[in-house]
Amino acid sequence: MTTRIAVTGAAGRMGKALIEAVCQSEDAVLGAAIVAPDSSLVGADAGELAGVGKQGVAIVNDLSTVVADFDVLIDFTSPSATVANASVCKAHNKPMVVGTTGFSPAEKAAFEADASTVPTCVASNFSTGVNLCFKLLDIAARVMGNDADIEVYEAHHRHKVDAPSGTALRMGEVLANAVNRDLNEVAVYGREGQTGARDRNTIGFATVRGGDVVGDHTVSFMCEGERVEITHKASSRLSFARGAVRAATWLVEKEPKIYDMQDVLGLK
């Protein structure tokens, strides 16, 4: 079965990568491409915009006008746009793949209320390698976590607007859950001045922004006499995009609820 996929944020860096990944897939075709309401790109061919050649899919600025043209929506946009798109998908019973990060508590609640009524895969990162890292972090934290100082480092391009990255925060959640801690209570986001000695129970986060870094993440388990580091470095957004397309084809005919990439990859 070939899955028809709609891509929101089609004019952005990730949107173009998603269109490219859909066009490369043997299991999916591009059904629709959506841009912001005020975009000047309405009517342009989505494939030509993404640099993959004419696809016969005209860009639109209203998701509700193309609901008949796709089976699954892939959404990597902004929290407010994703909340609105989830409402449309709920109304038309359309599965969603969502990689948007930076939700406020209210936005997250509104999104999840609608997303849980249709098959939805939500992940901070859709690359196979990062999701394997999540599994490795869980194992490492269970073995070493109570004897190690844990630090999460992440770096991204200068245009990224949220920090720490959604992937870094998800890593923190995995680590905290593995050692039975509440991340909200133990997370330390940056340090400055006279901080005092480090609390062993804390999980530190360090953020770097600059250049065109696609995404680097390292978790360091620092013990007396040894240090274990688990690192993932992305060199292309296509690794994320291909994972999102894989999730989209997997979602078809699944039960309505919220899944994550660990479900897609069978890592649970």
Swiss-Prot record:
Instruction: Tell me the enzyme class.
Output: oxidoreductase
Give the residues annotated as active site. Answer: H156, K160
Arranged from A to Z, the UniProt key words for this protein are:
Amino-acid biosynthesis, Cytoplasm, Diaminopimelate biosynthesis, Lysine biosynthesis, NAD, NADP, Oxidoreductase
Q: Which GO terms describe its cellular component?
A: cytosol
Q: Does the keyword NAD apply?
A: yes
Q: What is its EC number?
A: 1.17.1.8
Q: Give the main localization category.
A: cytoplasm
Which sites bind (S)-2,3,4,5-tetrahydrodipicolinate?
H157, G166, T167
Name the positions where NAD(+) binds.
Answer: G9, A10, A11, G12, R13, M14, G99, T100, T101, A123, S124, N125, F126
Q: Which domain of life is it from?
A: Bacteria
Write out the annotated subcellular location.
Cytoplasm
What pathway or pathways are given for this protein in its record? Amino-acid biosynthesis; L-lysine biosynthesis via DAP pathway; (S)-tetrahydrodipicolinate from L-aspartate: step 4/4
Q: Which reactions are catalysed by this chain?
A: (S)-2,3,4,5-tetrahydrodipicolinate + NAD(+) + H2O = (2S,4S)-4-hydroxy-2,3,4,5-tetrahydrodipicolinate + NADH + H(+); (S)-2,3,4,5-tetrahydrodipicolinate + NADP(+) + H2O = (2S,4S)-4-hydroxy-2,3,4,5-tetrahydrodipicolinate + NADPH + H(+)
Is NAD set as a keyword in this record?
Answer: yes
Q: Which family does it belong to?
A: Belongs to the DapB family.
Q: What is this protein called?
A: 4-hydroxy-tetrahydrodipicolinate reductase
Species name: Saccharophagus degradans (strain 2-40 / ATCC 43961 / DSM 17024)
